[in-house]
Amino acid sequence: MFRRNIITSAILLMAPLAFSAQSLAESLTVEQRLELLEKALRETQSELKKYKDEEKKKYTPATVNRSVSTNDQGYAANPFPTSRAAKPDAVLVKNEEKNASETGSIYSSMTLKDFSKFVKDEIGFSYNGYYRSGWGTASHGSPKSWAIGSLGRFGNEYSGWFDLQLKQRVYNENGKRVDAIVMMDGNVGQQYSTGWFGDNAGGENFMQFSDMYVTTKGFLPFAPEADFWVGKHGAPKIEIQMLDWKTQRTDAAAGVGLENWKVGPGKIDIALVREDVDDYDRSLQNKQQINTNTIDLRYKDIPLWDKVTLMVSGRYVTANESASEKDNQDNNGYYDWKDTWMFGTSLTQKFDKGGFNEFSFLVANNSIASNFGRYAGASPFTTFNGRYYGYHTGGTAVRLTSQGEAYIGDHFIVANAIVYSFGNDIYSYETGAHSDFESIRAVVRPAYIWDQYNQTGVELGYFTQQNKDANSNKFNESGYKTTLFHTFKVNTSMLTSRPEIRFYATYIKALENELDGFTFEDNKDDQFAVGAQAEIWW
């Protein structure tokens, strides 16, 4: 189109000149004719250049150029243009139309980052996620993970877990907002090349919709700033990242809740959720569905002193059983449901040089206490892998945790996860009813910071647990792990920055295995493994 316009303009410009030349042809010499043609050609080229420059201006975006910066020595920093076009620092954005009485430019400068955020906010859609994936091999056969929840994750996990969240704003007017949120999570197998969900060796590939809910703001007169949600969603999870389990977790099939409700100096989170369970009989072959409901209440972000906040939490789970379900428990060998609760507190300290530490105290009874007694994964579930069973007699368990990271000087950082637990008269999934247990697990991860993008360090893990059954027989489980690693990072924080690519060499040894009888390949009690793993969230 642009070339066609140029050609048309040239013809129109040449036409009158050609007519004039024809009328004077008989009275002009050859030299005079050539001079006239050269003059006309120069004028035509000048006009064409003018039109071309105007067309370029129409399609060139306005940018705000930055002045050349100088370094400490006074020299211009990178004064020469590179072969690759540089992004402009800012764009000019047209503001709302001004009234005749207003003065000033109707354009304002906006950085590309701000402009990108503006477009994203205007669309109202976001896509967030997490996954990990990697390769590993071991000294004898396929590498195996063991006691991740006690020995730590580095060089000890071979899964491909993922979370993918889609969020769309559907309304945002008059101080009211509505968002639709869907989250999928699951695992992609890292052993076989094929990974069809639900149709693979070992059932390693699976996926579910863990969240599907609507969240709003501004609809509750008494809490306009709070997030009010309805749907498949639970209260926020709090994780001990180095051990890959949660100190606070309330799974939900569906529910209703309120988050970040400002009351006094802190904020309240409250959720009422449904989570039905499969109640098994003594043979663990037959099951019945029992409807249970959970109330989860937290008062958080209570300021104590500078950079220190407190949270107080409580959770209660009760069943809504039918007459036939109770009859099966009384007469057909199904395990009786027992209500279960957990309450506690946590304190979070942030450090001036970066980093933090979180301390928590939790106490629970019945089936939640049973999960306190697990050495591998110790999240506060009400079931064991989705199955409810066992003689729960009101026994209790206590858990003390510490996790965090701290910078030591300019080139060292240390992360930690330490857990001490004990319980009395609980149902243990390894040693049965009326069991007592005591355990300690500790993982420390110091590293040398080369720069923003590189760290080299070691993760050291150790745990020991002793269970005592109803007959006072003692069962011990213990082990240790040493992992040397180098990581490629985008920031120096170990626990709060991703993406991260890590290369590792791990030696892991089971000292005692009287609770689970675990062995590595070839019935070995130890394993040496090397590998690489990527972990990312966005």
Swiss-Prot record:
UniProt GO BP: monoatomic ion transport; polysaccharide transport
Topological relation to the membrane, as annotated: Multi-pass membrane protein
Any one GO molecular function term: carbohydrate transmembrane transporter activity
Pfam annotation, one family: Sugarporin_N
Localization terms from the record: Cell outer membrane
Keywords: Cell outer membrane, Ion transport, Membrane, Porin, Signal, Transmembrane, Transmembrane beta strand, Transport
Secretion signal, residue range per the UniProt entry: 1-25
Annotated GO CC locations: cell outer membrane; pore complex
InterPro entries reported for this sequence: G_neg_Bact_CarbUptk_Porin, LamB-type_porin_N_dom, Porin_LamB, Porin_LamB_sf
Described purpose of this protein according to its UniProt entry: May be a sugar porin with a broad carbohydrate specificity.
Annotated family: Belongs to the porin LamB (TC 1.B.3) family.
The protein's name: Putative outer membrane porin BglH
Organism of this sequence: Escherichia coli O1:K1 / APEC
Gene: bglH
